[in-house]
């Protein structure tokens, strides 16, 4: 079974900009392909472990989210990774949709940390990655690519090692420790 991820984008300046950055992060990676499905995209691994990332297009917001849910239901798939992208005022809209199947929840919005209890209501055993203060696409996408490369290549995610690598990679970004 694939590692299925669902990423939520919202139709505002930050959501559109973050979506473009997400696509650009994966489009030049030989191990990944992007399939346009009109209201959403499917980013999937070409080699290694089978990883599928479903992301609604911000402009199609709810229609894209519904289309992803229908696509997953049709194939009897449930996301094990949930990713919120965009402004904090959309965070609750994402977190209320978290399925019990979620093993990892990534909240990349400003102050995402303050809504974590809501995420854990539906998936109490999930691991959480969240911003404390400022969320930024340059950090979110670098971390998401690194996480997905670990999954794709079958590496165990050892959190201390992962954070050490991220600190090294993002040390010049003023928001990393935020």
List where the protein language model places each region:
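Catalytic cores of nucleophile-dependent amide-cleaving enzymes
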Residues: 77-154
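Caspase-like cysteine protease fold
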Residues: 159-178
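Structural alpha-beta junctions
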Residues: 23-36, 122-129, 153-155
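Hydrophobic, Leu/Ile/Phe/Ala-enriched alpha-helical segments that form helix-helix packing faces
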Residues: 22-30, 71-76, 151, 170
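A domain-level signal for caspase-like cysteine endopeptidase catalytic cores
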Residues: 1-67
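Extracytoplasmic/secreted envelope proteins and their assembly/folding machinery
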Residues: 16-23, 65-73, 91-92, 116-117, ...
């Amino acid at each position: 079974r694939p590692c299925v991820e669902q990423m939520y984008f919202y139709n505002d300046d930050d959501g559109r900009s973050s979506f473009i950055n997400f696509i650009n992060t994966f489009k030049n990676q030989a191990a990944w392909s992007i399939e346009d499905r009109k209201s959403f995209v499917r980013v999937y691994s070409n080699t290694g472990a089978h990883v599928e990332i479903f992301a609604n297009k911000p402009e199609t917001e709810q229609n894209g989210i519904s289309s992803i849910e229908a696509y997953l239901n049709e194939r009897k798939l449930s996301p094990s990774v949930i990713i919120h992208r965009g402004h904090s005022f959309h965070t609750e809209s994402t977190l209320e949709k978290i399925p019990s199947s979620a093993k990892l929840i990534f909240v990349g919005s400003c102050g995402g940390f303050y809504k974590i209890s809501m995420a854990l209501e539906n998936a109490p055993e999930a691991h959480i990655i969240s911003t404390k203060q400022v969320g930024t696409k340059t950090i979110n996408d670098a971390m998401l690519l690194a996480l997905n490369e670990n999954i794709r290549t079958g590496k165990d995610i050892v959190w201390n090692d992962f954070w050490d690598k991220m600190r090294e990679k993002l040390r010049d970004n003023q928001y990393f420790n935020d």
